[in-house]
């Protein structure tokens, strides 16, 4: 008797590039916006920009989830040296916890293309662990993508049912960029709990979780950050402290409820606002 190979159980952790997670990449609102780029300057003389492909928009909340799921699969596959991932769109959407239908298939195809074509510009902001230096130049999130809308064995059958072609999911092959893989393999990474990440329904909470893990990897159990800097680093479009607090409060409550934060306080000192985070223990955050 020939036994079918056992499927590898889904990875409970997700490895992500710590250098990239310290920088803003994804808009946290999918509402209409005139933003043509994301710009972040952590210090004088250093600048980070995210530029969409001509005619497209900046990566948003769905793209954020797609990108994290790609790295979930990279972790699950044992960090393949070539960075190549192969999957059906159907299985990918199911793993993301998304509805599977013709609309979401097209949404996923569009998102993968957007991630591939979005340009990242680093002026001494992106840290390259292999050279222990900050990079100058352009980067991409994905090196290559290809999507075969029909499995070869099914092509002749699908020709008999043309109405199914538009919604047929297809098989994707995606290559993660080498610079991010190099950092992760070198240990310059953050580690998320996949089950806990999936319970966070707020895009802001998901982004905050990743940013707080950057602070943890840099040796912080408590992290104080200026509210204005936090807004730029996430990024958030709101600028007034009262507006930012309204956006952050539900995310903070969600992170505390999930056991990822022990406490968070917003404090005003002179004319500036700060956020003080107390992180939960590592054993709870990777459960």
Predicted feature locations:
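Charged, alpha-helix-forming regions
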Residues: 1-287
């Amino acid at each position: 008797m020939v036994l079918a190979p056992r499927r590898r159980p889904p990875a409970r952790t997700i490895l992500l590039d710590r250098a990239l997670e310290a920088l803003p990449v994804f808009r946290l609102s999918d509402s209409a916006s005139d933003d043509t780029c994301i710009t972040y300057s952590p210090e004088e003389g250093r600048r980070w920009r995210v530029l969409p492909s001509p005619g497209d928009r900046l990566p948003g909340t769905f793209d954020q989830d797609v990108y994290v799921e790609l790295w979930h699969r990279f972790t699950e596959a044992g960090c393949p040296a070539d960075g190549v991932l192969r999957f059906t769109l159907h299985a990918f959407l199911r793993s993301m916890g998304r509805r599977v239908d013709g609309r979401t298939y097209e949404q996923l195809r569009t998102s993968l293309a957007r991630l591939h074509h979005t340009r990242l510009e680093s002026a001494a902001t992106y840290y390259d662990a292999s050279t222990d230096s900050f990079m100058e130049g352009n980067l991409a999130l994905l090196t290559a993508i290809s999507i075969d809308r029909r499995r070869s064995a099914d092509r002749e059958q699908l020709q008999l049912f043309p109405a199914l072609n538009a919604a047929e999911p297809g098989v994707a092959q995606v290559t993660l960029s080498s610079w991010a893989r190099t950092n992760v393999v070198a240990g310059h990474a953050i580690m998320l709990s996949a089950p806990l990440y999936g319970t966070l329904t707020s895009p802001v909470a998901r982004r905050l979780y990743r940013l707080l893990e950057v602070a943890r990897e840099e040796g912080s159990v408590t992290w104080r950050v200026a509210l204005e800097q936090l807004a730029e680093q996430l990024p958030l479009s709101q600028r007034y402290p009262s507006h930012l607090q309204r956006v952050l409060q539900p995310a903070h409550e969600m992170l505390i409820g999930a056991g990822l934060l022990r406490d968070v306080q917003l404090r005003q000192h002179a004319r500036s606002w700060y956020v003080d985070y107390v992180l939960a223990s590592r054993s709870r955050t990777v459960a």
